[in-house]
Amino acid sequence: MDRLADYLLVQTEHPLTDTQQQTVQTLGQQLKAKGGYHKRLNRQVQKTSKSKASARLIMGIEAPEFFEATEHHLRYRLSFNEGYSTGLFLDMRDNRHRLLSNLIEPGFPVFEKGTGAAKVLNTFAYTCSLSVCAARAGAITTSLDLSQKYLEWGRENFRLNKLNPDDHDFIYGDTFDWMKRLAKRGEKYDLVILDPPTFSRSKVSGLFQAKRDYGRLAGNASALVRKNGMLLACCNSSGLAPSDFKADVRRGIRDAGRKIVQSFQAMQPLDFPVGENEPAYLKVSWMRLN
């Protein structure tokens, strides 16, 4: 169960039992929630319509089409009507805070001091929450996504936090295509963020599958990281084992002629528990490259 501002969101693979429904009602009253929603998890999300993927109201009053929630003093625009996601992936909360605070762990900052305003490239940017954190930390951001709708959502997230989106770049396009273009221009970034979906389809580069293509993605991204800059590689595909993810990323970095000089493997948050029936799906690696 997630709490998003004044609303609760319950996610299960199966319909709620009467007992579970009553638990939601009880917790809703205790937390003084205005409403509660239920979302059926579907592993075939690519084949599911937006209406079927969206959460449905099971208690209280309906949320507005768009509403705001606060995380680490930053505001984000959310919705229960936009399909599988609400606009913010809560399992990345800790990593947003690392970026916002410019501290991955003691002695390991995201951005080195004395380099001026850092440049950040956020690929597969979705609603640009990581870009907002980077911008609030003083960076100049470029958000790249294949959806005009979500890029505009990202601009609104900037406005909600009194950040002028006109001071930052928002690029509509294919990540692989734009990485090539940026490399030809000689662009270099202090941080390149990779947080792709498990599957993605583009007219330019075709089908992206994290399990098959992450190494190539990491290699292309590494070419855009300046010396002693950072690569943030994230993957939420349960089909890609942590050991394989690590090997794929490191192979891509090596093929690009780069080396990792410092790294940190972020754990899946405690409120996304790992068990025998629910192995860890989230892989996150912060890496400084030579």
Language model segments and positions:
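C-terminal catalytic and target-recognition region of SAM-dependent MTase-like enzymes
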Residues: 230-290
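Helix-to-beta-strand junctions that scaffold the AdoMet/dcAdoMet cofactor pocket
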Residues: 225-227
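Mobile active-site "lid"/loop adjacent to the S-adenosyl-L-methionine
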Residues: 150, 172, 189-220
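S-adenosyl-L-methionine
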Residues: 147-193
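Conserved SAM-binding motif I beta-strand of class I
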Residues: 140-145
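Conserved SAM-binding loop of SAM-dependent methyltransferases across substrates and taxa
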Residues: 127-139
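Non-catalytic substrate-recognition/targeting regions of SAM-dependent transferases
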Residues: 1-2, 18-90, 97
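Conserved class I S-adenosyl-L-methionine
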Residues: 110-126
